[in-house]
């Protein structure tokens, strides 16, 4: 008899715990498919070398060679988790700034302001026709929200 009581008690406990986890976890910014993109969890951020070259060329108004565009789009499409694509573009952009020693409000390259490079990088998924999710459920082609306005990007 006591085994039945323990069994039912554990069952009720698990149901309550699962319900609470779903309720509170769904509202957490640390849960969801984007949380799998965190390097601390073992995710390997893509260098996006082709996109790096494409964004630099576009920002200064140069023609982007077809091979560079193709490389960038393939590298972006190769990121299996759609939720990680904008984050990887953001990491790529930060590494460009670091490489060039860019400070806030400065030109990244001659004729290319930082804000323009941010918007150029944010639009790469649209240029490449590579799907990315956004919070509204649409599969917009531009990195969503205020990504391009973040001061650290």
Swiss-Prot record:
InterPro entries to which the protein is assigned, alphabetical: Allergen/soft/tryp_amyl_inhib, Allergen/tryp_amyl_inhib_CS, Bifun_inhib/LTP/seed_sf, Bifunc_inhib/LTP/seed_store
GO cellular component, one term: extracellular region
A GO molecular-function descriptor: alpha-amylase inhibitor activity
Location in the cell: Secreted
Signal peptide interval: 1-30
Modification note: The disulfide bonds are essential for the inhibitor activity.
SUPFAM superfamilies linked: Bifunctional inhibitor/lipid-transfer protein/seed storage 2S albumin (SSF47699)
UniProt cross-references to SMART domains, sorted A to Z: AAI
Pfam families (alphabetical): Tryp_alpha_amyl
Result of altering residue 97 to A: In very small amount
Gene3D superfamilies xref list: Plant lipid-transfer and hydrophobic proteins
Keyword entries, A-Z: Alpha-amylase inhibitor, Disulfide bond, Secreted, Signal
Tissue: Endosperm.
Functional description taken from the UniProt entry: Alpha-amylase inhibitor.
Protein's name according to its UniProt entry: Alpha-amylase inhibitor 0.28
Gene source species: Triticum aestivum (Wheat)
């Amino acid at each position: 008899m006591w085994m039945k009581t323990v069994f039912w008690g554990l069952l009720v406990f698990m149901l309550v715990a699962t319900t609470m986890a779903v309720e509170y976890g769904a509202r957490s910014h640390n849960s969801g498919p984007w949380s799998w993109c965190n390097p601390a969890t073992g995710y390997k951020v893509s260098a996006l070398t082709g996109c790096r070259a494409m964004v630099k060329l576009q920002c200064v108004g140069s023609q982007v060679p077809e091979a560079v565009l193709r490389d960038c789009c393939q590298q972006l499409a190769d990121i299996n988790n759609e939720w990680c694509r904008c984050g990887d573009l953001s990491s790529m952009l930060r590494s460009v700034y670091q490489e060039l020693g860019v400070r806030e409000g400065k030109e990244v390259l001659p004729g290319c302001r930082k804000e323009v490079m941010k918007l150029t990088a944010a639009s790469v998924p649209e240029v490449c026709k590579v799907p990315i999710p956004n919070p509204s459920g649409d599969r917009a082609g531009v990195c969503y929200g205020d990504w391009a306005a973040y001061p650290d990007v």
